[in-house]
Amino acid sequence: MKHSFRSFLLTLVAFSTLASCRDTSKLPAPKLLGSVPLITPVLSADTAKQYINFSRARASNAALTNLSPATRPIFEFSFDLDNSRDIKVATVEVYKSFRRTGNPPTVGPRVLVGAYNSFPVTISFNSQDLLTGLQRLVIPTDGSAAYVLNLKAANPAASNLLIQRGDLIVFTFEYILEDGSRVILTPIINTKVSLTAGGPANTTVPVLAATTQINKPYAMEAVIRDPIK
């Protein structure tokens, strides 16, 4: 009798396990998106467009005429979708942020560059357009509120004195899938800042998290530097 009852239990367990497997097999496979870039940004093949020339980006319009060439530098990169995946992307949103190297480095508020739904995409800026809308995040050491400074000079003809050699413009990406869901590989922290030094922190801005990957394929960097001779 005990043997028969034990056999019955084993049969019941086996049947339950089989039924469970069958039910699980009917569930849709999860989308493993948490750390999977869907595009790979690529720098321009033109080496002059692979960085931002410091002197030409910083110069006033008058000083620019004394430089050679007397034009603002251009930064350019492109990207295409990775069609090897089953994930269907409808739109790629591109953002830019200003990063000041230091200890610790700071990253300013991000600004939307554009939303793209036709691929491949080539994005090209002259330095004035690149600096437009960007802000430097300043964290005082005296404990007062963090504040932001506009990078581009208020007078379009004036020098852009706030940029330095070694500064970076960081481009990051978000994907909107065909089902409407959003993929975010570069976490954002909403941060309260002041719009003036010493003022109250009453403005909230979206800032890249400190742990954000800023290297390809997660992001693209435009380095402000001198030409390599």
What are these regions (language model features)?
Residues 189-192:
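Flexible, surface-exposed loop regions and adjacent strand-edge segments
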Residues 5-13:
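Sec-dependent signal peptide hydrophobic core
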Residues 3-5, 22-121, 165-167, 181-182, ...:
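Acidic/polar, low-complexity intrinsically disordered N-terminal segments immediately downstream
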